[in-house]
């Protein structure tokens, strides 16, 4: 007798479908017909009732949402002709709107900093989103910016004048400002402090000396491609070694490595060794290509035991590192 599919089975299947959809989304490929049919609620070609597809679609949405990639997986399904239930379709529209609003607000903040001689460095998702295929595909909850802490009070006054609520100021290595409907800015005075790994705090203490001036501005800074990647790895490991980090982190690695094909890995490996993250960098670099590469349908099936464990850990963590059950009622 055929075993009845349990919720755990369904979640597990949806997780691997999510990986396939993410790979298709960033590689610009079409998902397999069999996968699409599982989530198609209209014009179905199999004899299964549409309610089964609706249930699967809901689970896939919840799994994707837990990893903050629901806009990307939903967009891939939608572009392939799969009708999405209203909440999912709305989440895609919200992700696009949020990125547009963040971009406009960030431009105003940078203009203020330029006018007042304050150097600044956009971090993490602000940079990474540019390597995703379309607006809204790389979802973000906040904006991370490193800036000259000498001007922290001036920046605070500016943010308050713009209607922001000061959630945190001078209490940590970053100040936090929030404003409706979606704005959340984390303005970093430093990248790491002694509360993190001592070697990280020491390595990044004088980071300004390694920064490069952006084109067409006077105070906007950027990291060299290799240094940005190294910081990506350290930030990812901070969460990975703590409460966990979701699959979006592994996807970020893949997207960045696909965009930057001429990175100096001799330098990267040397610096990662200093930061005690060399093994994590290598393992994540290899794994992301096996999971999201265009031959992933074959390479996922041939993962070694340690690679499977690492992938399971990524999949078992929400984007902010919760190791609790992701899919709830």
Task: Go through the PLM ranges and name each one.
Residues 2-141, 147-329:
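Conserved NTP-donor binding/palm subdomain of two-metal-ion nucleotidyltransferases/polymerases, i.e.
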């Amino acid at each position: 007798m055929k075993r009845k599919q349990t919720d755990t089975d369904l979640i597990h299947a949806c997780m691997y479908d999510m990986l396939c959809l993410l790979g298709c989304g960033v590689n610009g490929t079409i998902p397999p017909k069999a996968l699409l049919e599982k989530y198609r609620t209209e014009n179905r070609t199999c004899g299964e009732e549409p309610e089964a597809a609706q249930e699967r679609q809901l689970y896939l949405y919840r799994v994707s949402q837990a990893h903050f990639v629901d806009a990307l997986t939903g967009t891939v399904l939608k572009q392939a002709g799969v009708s999405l239930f209203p909440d999912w379709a709305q989440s895609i529209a919200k992700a696009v709107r949020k990125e547009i609003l963040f971009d406009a607000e960030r431009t105003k903040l940078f203009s203020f900093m330029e006018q007042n001689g304050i150097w600044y460095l956009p971090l993490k998702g602000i940079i990474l989103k540019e390597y995703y295929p379309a607006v809204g595909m790389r979802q973000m909850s906040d904006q991370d910016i490193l800036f000259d802490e000498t001007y922290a009070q001036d920046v605070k006054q500016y943010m308050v004048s713009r209607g922001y609520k000061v959630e945190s100021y001078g209490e940590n290595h970053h100040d936090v400002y929030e404003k409706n409907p979606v704005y959340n800015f984390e303005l970093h005075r430093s990248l790491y402090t002694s509360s993190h790994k001592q070697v990280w705090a020491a390595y990044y203490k004088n980071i300004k000396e390694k920064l490069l001036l952006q084109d067409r501005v006077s105070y906007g800074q950027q990291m060299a491609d290799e240094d940005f990647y190294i910081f990506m790895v350290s930030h990812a490991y901070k969460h990975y070694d703590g409460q966990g980090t979701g699959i979006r982190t592994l996807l970020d690695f893949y997207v960045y490595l696909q965009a930057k094909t001429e990175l100096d890995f001799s330098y990267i490996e040397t610096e990662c060794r200093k930061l005690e993250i060399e093994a994590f960098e290598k393992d994540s670099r290899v794994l992301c290509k096996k999971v999201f590469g265009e031959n992933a349908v074959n390479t996922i099936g041939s993962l070694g035991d340690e690679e499977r464990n690492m992938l399971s850990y990524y999949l078992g963590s929400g984007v902010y590192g919760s190791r609790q059950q992701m899919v709830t009622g």
